[in-house]
């Protein structure tokens, strides 16, 4: 589902593992360019990327991105402070899921990034794994399969979760170059900021970690 659109369909429910970069695209949504990547030193998996004030890309200005995976081949993250104009109830309706718990339909949906904005991602607490779950840490996972939303709608889902459409992706070496150019501040992820902190406070809170 595209931001502000009620007619596009949401894609969630494919089984198997998550492909961190399904289309080998960058965070901008363009094909990778030859960047002569820097050497890979430290993985930022389970870290926040906090956009620096000078980052004027409209896709990432004043954003906080949760890095789900970061290897020599590239990185994938979900923006956690860009609420969309839709609620979870609209996503559930498109997937023919009937919520049986009060309040579920009112949960916020976030724009996770500019790539594949019709694809759903759920960042959630553990330990349950679903049909298509990437285990990030012992306590945090990312799931793209429909069964996690069915569990949430039935009141049997994870204790904490964040639902997003789309993701941010970086080709090999690109994120390292952006960090060297001071586009991002990085810091360890914090579950309270990820799930509980008011959206408007997440950028400053993450920057203070």
What role is predicted for each listed range?
Residues 2-14, 23, 30, 36:
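Low-acidity, Ser/Thr- and Arg-rich intrinsically disordered low-complexity segments
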Residues 37-163, 168-209:
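A short aromatic-anchored loop/beta-hairpin motif
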């Amino acid at each position: 589902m595209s931001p502000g659109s009620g007619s596009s369909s949401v894609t969630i429910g494919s089984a198997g593992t998550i492909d961190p970069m399904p289309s080998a695209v960058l965070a901008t949504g363009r094909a990778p360019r030859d960047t002569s990547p820097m050497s890979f030193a430290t993985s930022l998996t389970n870290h926040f990327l906090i956009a620096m004030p000078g980052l004027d890309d409209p896709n990432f200005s004043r954003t906080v991105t949760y890095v789900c995976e970061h290897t020599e081949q590239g990185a994938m993250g979900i923006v956690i402070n860009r609420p969309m104009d839709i609620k979870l109830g609209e996503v559930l309706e498109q997937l023919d899921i009937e919520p049986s718990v009060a309040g579920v339909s009112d949960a916020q949906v976030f724009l996770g990034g500019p790539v594949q904005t019709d694809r759903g991602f759920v960042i959630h607490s553990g330990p349950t794994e679903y049909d298509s779950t990437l285990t990030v840490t012992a306590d945090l996972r990312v799931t793209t399969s429909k069964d996690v939303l069915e569990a949430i709608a039935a009141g049997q889902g994870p204790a904490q979760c964040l639902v997003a459409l789309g993701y941010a992706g970086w080709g090999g070496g690109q994120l390292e170059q952006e960090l060297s150019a001071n586009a991002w501040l990085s810091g360890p992820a914090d579950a309270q900021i990820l799930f509980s902190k008011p959206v408007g406070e997440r950028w400053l809170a993450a920057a203070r970690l």
